[in-house]
Amino acid sequence: MKKLVAYITSAYPEKSFSIDLALALGDNGVDTLELGVPFSDPVADGPLIEKANHKSLEFGFKFKHLLEISEAVAPKVDTLWMGYFNSFYQQDMSKLIPLASKIGVNGLIIPDLPHEEALTYSDLFKENSLSNISFVAPTDSEERIKKVISDSQKFIYMVAYAGITGSGQAEDLQPFLSSIKKYSDTPVYVGFGVSAKTAKDKVKGADGVIVGSAFIDILLKDNLTYAQKIKQCSELAQIL
């Protein structure tokens, strides 16, 4: 059975909604929740997630909201934080990582933290039983792939398309996937460039799929009530 990771932007449109949505997703087939930390310049994300980031910040998102959502959700749904390094660095990594572990968060996904710099924090993550998810991209050399995944934890984040999230580009990922699996037994999840339409094709041979923009697209629809948004996201989770 393939694993499903769902990304949602924290506290968009508000904290209590994020908690209700996260728990509903957990009840409807989502194995892992990726709680996005709103950031003003989310360079790796597509227009939908960027818009949700900006709206959450406009609505007054504070880092404490992420902590409060996580405290409510992490005991019930496997939870990761996804955010840009500056968001975490400003909280003091030496204090934040132990706090995340105490809350029950199981790992961080930091797309703009290069592997070489992430090594600075490897002991901190290990001491607190927290995973720092490794990224590999189709543009990486075989040598770099070997280096990056040598210390991979929980799962390897395989970038489906060397661009921005949610692009839904169609391409053959099997050779790239095979090259990763040659060097590691760590599960490989496909993300970045996965849309609702391409999820089933792109997950072939992988151990899981990460979907964000398809859920955010629903959340951005102003004509839907909160209950309708949760219902549609839950239905999407069931068919992915």
Feature annotation, model-predicted:
Residues 130-167:
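Histidine/lysine/aspartate-rich catalytic loop segments that bind and position anionic ligands
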Residues 15, 39-51, 57-69, 88-94, ...:
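Active-site-adjacent beta->alpha loops and helix N-cap segments on the catalytic face
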Residues 32-42, 103-109, 113-117, 157-166, ...:
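Glycine-rich phosphate-binding active-site loops on the catalytic face of alpha/beta enzymes
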Residues 9-14, 82-90, 114, 136-139, ...:
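Glycine-rich beta-to-alpha transition loops that act as phosphate-gripper elements at the mouths
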Residues 1-9, 69-71:
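N-terminal amphipathic alpha-helix/helix-capping segment at the start of soluble metabolic enzymes
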Residues 15-25, 140-151, 190, 194-209:
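Catalytic cores of alpha/beta
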Residues 6, 25, 36, 100, ...:
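Conserved, mostly hydrophobic/aromatic
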Residues 4-8, 33-35, 79-83, 108-110, ...:
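Hydrophobic faces of well-ordered beta-strands that scaffold small-molecule active sites
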